[in-house]
Design a protein with these regions (language model features):
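A short glycine-rich, Lys/Arg-flanked "PGG" loop and its adjoining helix->strand segment in the class I
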Residues: 136-148
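Conserved beta-strand signature within the Rossmann-like core of class I S-adenosyl-L-methionine
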Residues: 149-156
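Acceptor-substrate binding/catalytic loop of class I
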Residues: 164-179
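Core SAM-dependent methyltransferase catalytic element
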Residues: 187, 200-221
Length: 221
């Protein structure tokens, strides 16, 4: 499956940024596999406590939220996604949590976060940074909705790795660690830690790949 045509690479890139149709469901499943370790690493950086309000940007089908609730069942989770298909899929697949009101998945435009100022304790996101239309403005939105002492955890694959992946030339904005740190600090966040890990994954093109990912934890103080 590794020898995809340019058109297939474009379609894959489009699905990764905005899953839709039958291929969108399949792409979400492949992302679960490819990003599982990365998602867990990001979640592990959240200081979780009872009644914490957690917002995730781009949860896809959201199958990983069970890991959050295993850490503490008394959390409030909101997942926002630009894909209507993913919002529907995540709501159905996580009915144990959505039916009880512990979790909710909502559609977003990817630019404005429809939440009150200082209403969220922690925000996390994995592999969405590349698709933000206006990254500085979006980070300002994240800063706005976070409470004081709020946590932001970003998981992404840095430019040095991403530029070797053929489909990332279609619609991906690539970042190195320093550029992300600078963006965060420009908005007013304080960087608490930056960690990197190298892993072997089954990529979205179906091949086994070695990749390095970065997790940055920042605070609103």
């Amino acid at each position: 499956m590794g020898n995809l045509t340019e058109q297939e690479l474009k379609e894959l890139a489009s699905q990764l940024s905005h899953p839709k149709g039958e291929n969108g469901i399949a792409t979400a499943k492949s992302m679960n596999v490819a990003n599982d370790n990365m998602i867990r690493n990001v979640i592990n950086q959240i200081d979780i406590f009872d009644t914490i309000n957690i917002l995730e940007i781009g949860p896809g089908n959201g199958l990983h939220i069970n890991y959050l609730f295993e850490k503490n069942p008394n959390i409030n989770y909101i997942g926002i996604d630009i894909s209507e298909l993913m919002v529907q899929d995540a709501t159905e697949l996580n009915s144990e949590f959505t039916n009880s009101g512990k979790a909710i998945f909502e559609l977003t435009d990817g630019e404005i976060i429809e939440k009150e100022n200082s209403s969220i304790n922690a925000i996390f996101t994995v592999n969405t940074l590349y698709f933000w239309k206006n990254p500085k403005e979006y980070l300002q939105e994240l800063f706005r909705v976070l409470k004081n002492d709020g946590q932001l955890i970003l998981g992404f694959v840095p430019k040095s790795t991403m530029e070797k992946i053929p489909f990332t030339k279609y619609g991906f904005e690539l970042y190195d660690n320093e550029s992300v740190q600078n963006l965060l600090e420009e908005v007013g966040f304080k960087i608490e830690k930056t960690v990197s890990e190298t892993e072997e994954v089954l990529s979205n093109t179906g091949d086994k790949k070695i990749r390095t990912f970065t997790v940055i934890k920042a605070l609103k103080l």
